[in-house]
């Protein structure tokens, strides 16, 4: 259990550090050495979890698509507005959201699925739900409108970044909705939509930070419990720490590929177990 908690904590450290590096430098200029420095992990630990820089970037992209969740209950259009405002807030305060957006704009994954596809599909589904519930005009094409909405948001956040470091992004997103809503929704519905969003995003962010802090504390406690158990076991066996070939290092819990290795599995070790 302690080893598993450590692995999760290491994975999290690598992804968070990589997000800040990609946010600062973009994909091409991001260096593995800088990710290692910010994550405070070894090269072996990084390659235990990720085969390449692209794999790390993909993990960030996957996290970005989970940043916003659209509520299925209530007004589909208000849920779309709230989701957009939630992501605008994340772009201001969350390096993971900024890194994922920058990677998408840079077109890092041109060989795979388009990075905007999940956003467009999710938006189209909410517009379809809006049609079913009588909020959205029946004659509009949800997919076409979804592409316009996602493209508009993308352009607005780029301009906001250049103008104010995204300080005015939420206000600009509200203006975007004031322009788009009349073309897709009934006037009676628009009167009840709040373009600024209806969620206290600051309170929501505080709650999320508290949850993450609690999870990190639990993981650290589990790691400490595992270390205590290992110490007790070593004391009962004589405490020499010399096993196998008597190297003084002892076998790693996960074998040659354990995340604590200084290099990827097998690197630096010659035949017979002698360090090269």
Curated annotation (Swiss-Prot):
GO BP terms: negative regulation of DNA-templated transcription; negative regulation of sporulation resulting in formation of a cellular spore; sporulation resulting in formation of a cellular spore; streptomycin biosynthetic process
Outcome of mutating residue 115 to S: In mutant HO1; lacks DNA-binding activity
Keywords associated with the record: Cytoplasm, DNA-binding, Repressor, Sporulation, Transcription, Transcription regulation
Superkingdom of the organism of origin: Bacteria
Gene Ontology MF terms: DNA-binding transcription factor activity; transcription cis-regulatory region binding
A GO CC term attached to the entry: cytoplasm
Biased composition (Gly residues): 236-257
Stretches with biased composition (Low complexity): 221-235
Region span, Disordered: 207-276
Domain HTH tetR-type: start-end pairs: 8-68
Biased composition (Basic and acidic residues): 207-220
PANTHER family given in the database record: HTH-TYPE TRANSCRIPTIONAL REGULATOR BETI, HTH-TYPE TRANSCRIPTIONAL REGULATOR RUTR
Domain notes: Binds DNA through its N-terminal H-T-H motif and binds A-factor via its C-terminal region.
Function: Represses adpA expression by binding to the promoter region in the absence of A-factor, causing repression of streptomycin production and of sporulation.
Protein name: A-factor receptor protein
